[in-house]
Amino acid sequence: MPPHLIDGQPHQHIDRPRRVRQPGEPLRIGIGGPVGSGKTALVAALCRTLRDEISVAVLTNDIYTTEDADFLRRHAVLPDERITAVQTGGCPHTAIRDDITANLDAIEDLIATNEPLDLILVESGGDNLTATFSSGLIDVQIFVIDVAGGDKVPRKGGPGVTFSDLLVINKTDLAPMVGADLTVMARDAAAVREGRPTAMISLTEDPAASEVLAWVRAHLTEAHQTDHAH
């Protein structure tokens, strides 16, 4: 699919109501986090398993390129028509939080091309710890950080670390090399997240991202049960 563009002009915040998923609509899961934290690799890992179980598609957000979508296509994690991209310009958070129009249009195109869909993974462009998804765009969100930033990152907090539905601390296999204490990271994450779950993963040691996969499956099951209750 051709990329959806944001024109690069200043954008005003557009207030949208919180999304209420309708029966039969695909579940939308946002995956955000800083540059290099492993978002695209996590998306690829989830797709490799879920593509044999459900109907899934991916929407990526890149600043000026379609690099993340191209990576997923090169690695054939899904058929090309199930992967599309939004080019966000210089402010990647704008496209997922303030003016989500381009993402909503891209989602409509994915659904029209691939219906029926069970799940759409929406990957944000790389941003800082303050980036979050609009509740009008996604149903639940995952925020990915990695140990390379040091064990102080969970303690710093920020909306993504604190309020995401699932916090993923990635690349745990690198902890000894960067001097990060995983126990400290887990403790600090628990302190700021007030009971929200945290998954500590290494795609090197667990290529399927089993803990994250289980969380996604649980939300898919919940969505399926909700549909059948109507």
From Swiss-Prot:
Keyword Lyase applies: no
Any one Gene Ontology cellular component term annotated for this protein: cytoplasm
Tree of life domain: Bacteria
Key word Nucleotide-binding present: yes
Location relative to the cell: Cytoplasm
Entry GO MF terms: GTP binding; GTPase activity; nickel cation binding
Binding site for GTP: 33-40
Main location: cytoplasm
Alphabetized UniProt keyword annotations: Chaperone, Cytoplasm, GTP-binding, Nickel insertion, Nucleotide-binding
GO BP of this protein: urea catabolic process
Pfam families per record: cobW
Assigned protein family: Belongs to the SIMIBI class G3E GTPase family. UreG subfamily.
Record's subunit section: Homodimer. UreD, UreF and UreG form a complex that acts as a GTP-hydrolysis-dependent molecular chaperone, activating the urease apoprotein by helping to assemble the nickel containing metallocenter of UreC. The UreE protein probably delivers the nickel.
Function comment: Facilitates the functional incorporation of the urease nickel metallocenter. This process requires GTP hydrolysis, probably effectuated by UreG.
Name the UniProt record assigns to this protein: Urease accessory protein UreG
Gene name for this UniProt entry: ureG
